[in-house]
Curated annotation (Swiss-Prot):
Site-annotated residues for Transition state stabilizer: K327
Domain of life: Bacteria
Name recorded for this polypeptide: Ribulose bisphosphate carboxylase large chain 1
EC number: 4.1.1.39
Gene symbol of the encoding locus: cbbL1
Length: 473
């Protein structure tokens, strides 16, 4: 065996980390980056630099390289592609050996793949567009605490999307008034009400008071309607210890579901809370607050499809995914892509939806896609078409903004939903015939009729900032 000798100095990254003939292994974690290089840095060198700095390379040769097998552990840039319609950047595909990462730790994956490399001077901008997790890695992660089927069985609700509502105003209500708003919405026909992401334990409403009044509302609405109800109690807290304290109290008062802000609260805290929920029979609703800071810039950051995959591995039974038709960012094709990544057991590569790799989830359960943000009854036909049954449609202002109050707003949404589900079963085209379907239902529901009149002119027609670039192999 030849003995390698140490030679100090600086070499080009491409000499070790650009390998266009590499065939990725089934056990590799694959990444697609969008790279905008600095002037004068060629494509292969920039891609190799990203591969090196996100795996085991550094800026100079070090003698300790001889103490390990770099050919095994290094990341490899193996393919480059043009970005359609944008000649300032390109896609770089990088393969990482699975042994670079701690089992079951999406935190460890992120510290390498989206760590210091994102501040690297050789690239002007860098975006992680997609990841392929091999089934060997998926099997080491906890995933959703329960998943879609278990939640439906717990609630005894099948064959339709679930209905929810975020209580407004999001800040400032007392605990008693907050609970009253929940009760009215639940008895009006909703399945869930929800804490907003920034409701924690502020001076105007401490968390324990909110939990008590809300669960009183939930139990009263259940008794009156005969349906299982719930409220997403946000247990996001300043410390993990306080988070678990709130979760334990929610369990004590028999809440069926709690909530966590997984990006603001942190992936480590989220994985721990998901494990707790799994062990304690509690459903876990996930809010994505802070995501747009990370994913909205089309050239730098992390695409939301990656954040969706990370959440599914980390654990959550629900995830906010945008609405397509509401007030929040998200084009239809991309949204359908990450909805599938959240719910399906196998998602094939589909560049028309921005999916760069096949993704096999094995037997890991999926989660409910949550549509929330600027939606009202006129959006119901499109929402049922886009999101399907395994979703939660959350109308905040579209419930509490009803002229006749919360219960009437909830009733209007329930009637609209059931009309759309029935029409779908009859083979009607919901988006083309939506107006006729809702108008016919409103003839027997004054609450829906008033809701349709109230919001008939409300639209959110703004251009999507992060446009889907459809690329071919």
């Amino acid at each position: 065996m030849a003995v390698k000798s140490y030679q100090a100095g600086v070499t080009q990254y491409r000499q070790s980390y650009w390998q266009p003939d590499y065939m990725p292994l089934d056990t590799d974690i694959l990444a697609c980056f969008k790279i905008t290089p600095q002037p004068g840095v060629d494509r292969e060198e920039a891609a190799a630099a990203v591969a090196a700095e996100s795996s085991c390379g550094t800026w100079t040769t070090v003698w300790t390289d001889l103490l390990t097998d770099l050919d095994y552990y290094k990341g490899r840039a193996y393919r480059l592609e043009d970005v359609p319609g944008d000649d300032t950047c390109y896609y770089a595909f990088i393969a990482y050996p699975i042994d670079l990462f701690e089992e079951g730790s999406v935190v460890n994956v992120f510290t390498s793949l989206v760590g210091n490399v994102f501040g690297f001077k050789a690239v002007r901008a860098l975006r992680l567009e997609d990841l392929r997790f091999p089934i060997a890695y998926v099997k080491t992660c906890g995933g959703p605490p329960h998943g879609i089927q278990v939640e439906r069985d717990k609630l005894n609700k099948y064959g339709r999307p679930l209905l929810g509502c975020t209580i407004k105003p999001k800040l400032g209500l007392s605990a008693k008034n907050y609970g009253r708003a929940c009760y009215e919405a639940l008895r009006g026909g909703l399945d869930f009400t929800k804490d907003d992401e920034n409701i924690n334990s502020q001076p105007f409403m401490r968390w324990r008071d909110r939990f008590d009044f809300v669960m009183e509302a939930v139990q009263k609405a259940e008794q009156e309607t005969g349906e299982r109800k719930g409220h997403y109690l946000n247990v996001t807290a300043p410390t993990p210890e306080e988070m678990y304290k709130r979760a334990e109290y929610a369990k004590e008062i028999r809440a069926p579901i709690i909530m966590h802000d997984y990006l603001a609260g942190g992936l480590c805290a989220n994985a721990g809370l998901a494990n707790w929920c799994r062990n304690n029979g509690m459903l876990l609703h996930i809010h994505r607050a802070m995501h747009a800071v990370i994913d909205r810039n089309p050239h730098h950051g992390i695409h939301f499809r990656v954040l969706t995959k990370i959440l599914r591995l980390s654990g959550g039974d629900h995830l906010h995914t945008g609405t397509v038709v509401g007030k929040l960012e998200g084009d239809r094709a991309s949204t359908l892509g990450w909805i599938d990544l959240l719910r399906e057991s196998f998602v094939p590569e589909d560049r028309s939806r921005g999916i760069f790799f096949d993704q096999d989830w094995g037997s890991m359960p999926g989660g409910f896609a949550v549509a929330s943000g600027g939606i009202h009854v006129w959006h119901m036909p499109a929402l049922v078409t886009i999101f399907g049954d395994d979703s939660v449609l959350q109308f905040g202002g579209g419930t509490l903004g009803h002229p006749w109050g919360n219960a009437a707003g909830a009733h209007a949404n329930r009637v609209a939903l059931e009309a759309c589900v029935q029409a779908r079963g009859e083979g009607r085209h919901l988006e083309k015939e939506g107006k006729d379907i809702l108008t016919a239902a409103a003839a027997h529901s004054p609450e829906l009729k008033i809701a349709m009149e109230t919001w008939k002119e409300i639209k959110f027609e703004f251009e999507t900032m992060d446009k889907l670039a459809i690329a071919n192999k």
